[in-house]
Amino acid sequence: MTDSRRQGELSLQRSFTQVGAALAALGILPGLLASGLLSGCVRDALTCGEGFSKCALVCADLTSDAANCGGCGVACKAGELCQNGRCRCPPDATLCGNACVVTASDPANCGGCAGTGGGQACLTNQVCELGQCQTSCVSPRSTQCGRSCVNLASDVNNCGACDHPCRDAQSCHSGRCTHDIVAACFNTGQVVGIQGETDLQSTRARVGSFPQALGSLDDVLLVADGIDQRLRQARLDDFSPLPGDVRLGASPNHIWVDDPLIYVVNSLGNTLQILQRQTSPANGGLQLSTIGEVNFGPVSSPQAIAFIGTVAYIPFWSGPAQVVRVDVADPRAPAVTRVFDLRDLDLHPFDGALTYARPGAVAVAWGKIYVALQNLDPRFAPGGPGMLAKIDPVSESVTAINLGADVCLNAFWLSAADDALYVSCAGKIIYGPGYQPLAVDKSGVVVLNEREERVSTWNVACAPGSAGCIPPSVGRFAIFNHRLYLGDQAGGRVFVVETLADHQLIERRGHNPVNGGPPLLACPRDTGMLSLVIDVIAVP
């Protein structure tokens, strides 16, 4: 490394130390975040936040509140849910007359609406199972609830017990009502649930002040509050708050759950914090306590964590570009055992550019460690193509992977699934007055196979000629049932991309969808300001 590059790096370290804002270590628009120009400052309890309307004594989300659907006091009928401000039947139900019924198990409309709908009304001594009238339930997974045969492990109307319906956009996971995907809105302090495949959204709920990272354990949602520095708890079914907050370090950026342990990477606190739960979740929530910690030193800015066995790998975004290996075999005494230096990697800088690796996300695939390199210049703009660093845990070699400037700038998040490595690229964002995004270049997803070949790409963009569309920039994402749910760092959206058997990518919810619809508006947005979907997780 040249002396000028080292001096430039030291200068950047000093500038980040002077910033002093909790979000400077996120790696997302550091100057913008530090300036506080994002929308949705938390307001006092008497005022409804962004995305909510005051209806009598409550703040209601008119887009998804079944009691205030599209307007205050507009209530949906029993069995209906509210989506985009309209009452409708759930995906597994059919409108028969004026009621939403599940024709697979409804004895009055078995197999379809009775009469002209192709179904039939079962006799009083019969039950309805899989759309057929029978004398009894025959499937080994079926339980008789009244005259309906249902699977208590997955039936949203009888989840875990007869007549125990799941609400809104929830699914039934192993007899427990929950959401398939949860997204966090940093600006407004809210979380929102999404039902996989149907892409239905729940009512947004306030959890803390500025949720920065999410995790889940049993039926509890874990929310790391980026400003209050607390690990908050909420129920996964309705996001109602639970007691048991735990103090975290500054700017908690990533949560990794390995029951009974919870690992939290505190980016401005420069620590790895290890918590352990003491009890099963009850009405009082989880009892958590910190049992171990590693302090990495000032201006390291650890970003994320991934594991091979009891060995953790954590990238440092600030300071010298490094990845540390931490032995957590004894979580009460974690220890750094190796430091991998990334500064001498060939970052393929653009002509005349001085660029820094800025390692962020990390994932394990095919027994190797892959680290996303944002590859930014001193002004935090892309100084070269989106890159990855690969660490071989056996040989301890470190190599660089060029994702290609033709499709990827600012490699941001990554995850392994279905024998492939998926990488999101935040792109190059061009701002106008007031930090309004005017254009985003080379944001999307790159898919690599085991040979580290690019097998598929997807570019996120507004539809050609569309007016008023905020240029999207995708960041963190979750994978659920062969679908990527990608958080938008500019307009509060979630884009949905399906992965086919050959790893080809098909946009299902976006501005250019194939047999789909528009992107999900997960987080509300004030005119002229950014709205940040800061984290997205899939619930096991």
Identify the function of each model-found stretch.
Residues G20-G36:
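Bacterial N-terminal signal peptides
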Residues M1-Q18:
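N-terminal secretory signal peptides that target proteins for export/translocation
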Residues V42-H179:
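Cysteine-rich modules of extracellular adhesion/ECM and protease-associated proteins
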Residues L38-G40:
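C-terminal motif of bacterial Sec signal peptides marking the signal peptidase cleavage site
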Residues R43, S171-P540:
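Predominantly soluble domains enriched in secretory-pathway, periplasmic, or organellar proteins
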Residues Q7, S11, G31, S35, ...:
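Compositionally biased, low-complexity segments
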Residues S4, V19, P30, C137, ...:
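Serine/threonine-rich, low-complexity intrinsically disordered segments
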